Amino acid sequence: RSFQMNNSHSALALEHEEHGHLVSPSALVQAWLQACKGSQLTLMTGRTVSSVRPAVDAHQWCAVDQDNHIIAQADVAVVCNAFAATRLLPAHMTLGLTAVAGQMTYGPADPHATSCKQPALRHKGVYAPNFQTNRTETIWSMGATYHRGISSPTPDPRDDDANRASLAQLATSSPQAMSALTLFDKQAASGELRSWVGVRCASIDRLPICGSLPDASSMATLTDSSKRDNVATAPGLFGLLALGSRGLSLAPLLGEVLAAQIDGDTATLLPPDLLRAIDPRRAPLQVMRQARRQQC
């Protein structure tokens, strides 16, 4: 993987290998949590945060549940729950987040594929020949599709058809994909084929949002001539959002970048123009200008 540059500014981009590799997200998260053992991290699970809001003294932030009880309170809050951030943040904090639904088609893995290592393949999605789910079930998968502006988790048979078409395209040059296509059709006929929908989070310019979040109360004062330096930020409130389909790749890097920003570290892992490109303060200006264009 590498960063690519263009003449105007740095761009977050990844070079994909033709044959990819598989990582279990849950195993990766567990490894990160294990690495934090001995730190001051307190993991709280089984709680639903309904909103993030200033504490009464306005010097801290509170994570509040649906019954208005404070779950946690701290000097710094980081919102990093993808498109669901729209329900945590104030309604008038306009970041221009967009849902991008994607459907994966999957079924029981071919026993032959589980007995030997086969690479993942890419074409308008990824074909993964075999991996274990959290239920210790071994499956294959193909996907996912893209539907910008859609947040519904309901599967659509047309997306299964789209995933089959992508797999069929792979099959024109890959015997492995041809076998997978045969398995796809067999399981579709037997009723073993299944679908799963996830919702990505994207920004207006499709770049991540990483850093100090804008002060919602100051957004009403912005005008067409406002610059990002005119956008006030909410002290202690940060965000890591809009990672799109690259969250697994970008989250570790941008997590380090965000930690440095919170600590006020002047050294950075990214060049200044790239930091500016992912600055959350750009978001309300983009939302305002997009609305102006739509009115014309």
Model-derived features: positions:
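Hydrophobic/aromatic beta-strand patches that form the interior of the parallel beta-sheet core
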Residues: 44, 78, 238-240
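Short loop/edge segments at beta-strand edges and connector loops
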Residues: 45-47, 53, 194
